[in-house]
């Protein structure tokens, strides 16, 4: 019997080392002044930024879900990392936190250095958009756990907020206005249903034109999740904001109640915005009920802010100056906590 090696068992340490060699300079470009030391050690060191009286660390972890299946089918891996970062930084942003640093986890059947590099380029691009440093990560090669050519991603983000300025929804009051920021598409939620409709019901291929949009299926489904950090931080630093929500799995109806106190109800005017064509196509082709659409997809609204009525115009102007499409969706009323969709 020949002597066995780790490579013969399916784990290529040399490929892992080559991946690290490629991604370290990419990550280095994202570093903030608060990062102490370099990349590649056993742990990362990040000091809390100056200027805070009582800084609080705010953390979140998330993945990309089955949007990865579209990346596998198209062999396009350069933007999926943006989605990974977006899911985390938009979550800590909800509480008024500035994203500080990010770590990624890539698990795969076989390490392909070029593919790992493409993924991390996307992660770094997302970190640059979100203003946080990519300080480290883990790439795990597990041939007996993942199918050939497939991988999974997870991300972990830490942000910082002034304790006295944490946004937690407790100040939400009747008469407050609900503002919505346009999404870039499906973002990173609802893909199990979307893929079933697009590939099984409609029978489309990834290079086929997507109905109504003029884009390919691949371009439509791989459009990166929008990162709202910079314009939203500008708004919360200048104006009163009572609550915010990142519209992920559960949609508007599932996520907005998470930041509303008892006795507060959001009344959303469905006619306030035009639902993008991608969602209309999915609903019509899949014969999906309206309520199911709104609790599965973002329906064109990726982020929500609840603000005092007197501040609504000023907040809208600040967000618009930052490049956001802002929609006045409705208002807060007294009532059972939840969301009411009106025609």
Feature roles, as predicted:
Residues 12, 62, 175, 246, ...:
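Residue-level signature of catalytic and energy-coupling elements of molecular machines
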Residues 52-53, 64-67, 162-165, 186-188, ...:
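Short, acidic Gly/Pro/Ser/Thr-rich loop/turn segments
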Residues 25-184:
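Glycine-rich phosphate/pyrophosphate-binding loop regions near the starts of catalytic domains
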